[in-house]
Amino acid sequence: MAKGSGKTTFKDTVTAYERLRREIAAGRYAPVYLLMGEEGYFIDRIADQLAGTVLTEAERDFNQIVVYGKDTDEGTIINYARQMPMMGRYEVVIVKEAQSLRKPEQLSLYTAAPSPSTILVVCYKGKSLDKRTQLYKHIVQKGEVLESVRPRDYEITAWLGDFVQSKGCTIEPKALGMLTDHLGTDISRISNELAKLLTFLPEGTKRITAQHIEDNIGISKDFNNFELTKAISEKNMARAMLIADHFRRNPKDNPLTVTLSALFTHFQRIFIVNYKRWEIRHKNVPAPSDAELSALLKLPNPFFLNEYK
C-alpha cells in the first residue's frame, strides 16, 4: 500500500513503479489505483500492464471498461465500478484523463468502500490530486498511489542506463549524452526512440554506440551540445565555433534554449570544480574522490569528469 507523505522524488517514483510492476505481474491487485503526476510515462505503463494482464482476452469484452474524464462523469464511473463481473473474477474500470473530471472528489463515494471484485484505475495526468481530499486518503488506505515525478536533468541518464540494461543492452556514455542532450528529460519520447532503435540494431548487438544513435535516430554524433561543451573544455575554439555555426544553420534541430541550458550547467560545474580547488589550497580541505566530485557535480558517471578537471 502506498503511503503518501512528504515530497515525492523521481527516485521514489521509480522505486514505487518497479514495486507495482512486480505486484501486478504476481497477480496481487489492489481494488483502486491512483496514478497521478506530471510524468505520463509511468502512469501509462502501469495502466497498460493492468489493462493487458488482469483479464484474459475473452474476459475483456465483458469486464473491462475504459472511459475518459472529459467524456464521462463521476456517477457513471461509480456505476461501472459497482457492477459485478460476468464470467470472470474482476471488473476492470480504467479512467483516463481523470484530471478532466468536473468533480473527481465525488469518486470518494465509491472509494470509501470499494468492491473487492473491481479494479478501478484512475489516471490523473499533468498534476497531482490534492492530498487533503477524502478521495486521496481513501486510496492511500485501501489501494495504491503512484505519484509520477519528472526527472531532473542529472537523474535521467541513470534511469536511461537502467532502462537500456533491462532490454539486455548497455549504452556508451557519449550515446547517453547525445540522447539526453537532444531529447531532454522526456522519458516517453526517449523510451519510444530507444524501442525503435533496438528493433533496428543488428542481431546480437549488446552495446549501443553514438554511431547507432546517429544512424537510427538522426541525432548527429558530431554536432550536438555534448560535443560543444567538450570542445569548450578542450579549448578547441575552432571546433566549438564549427558546432555553433551548425546550430545556427539548423535551429529546428538545435533549439537555443536547450543549448543555453547545457552551457549554463557546464560552466556551473566548472565553477564548482575551481571553487573546490580554492578550498583545497586555502582551507586545507581534503580533495574529493572522483566519485564524490561526480556526485557533487550531479554527473551520471565519473567518465565525464575529465571535461571539468
Please annotate each region the language model reported.
Residues 224-227, 239-309:
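C-terminal alpha-helical interaction modules of replication/initiation AAA+ assemblies
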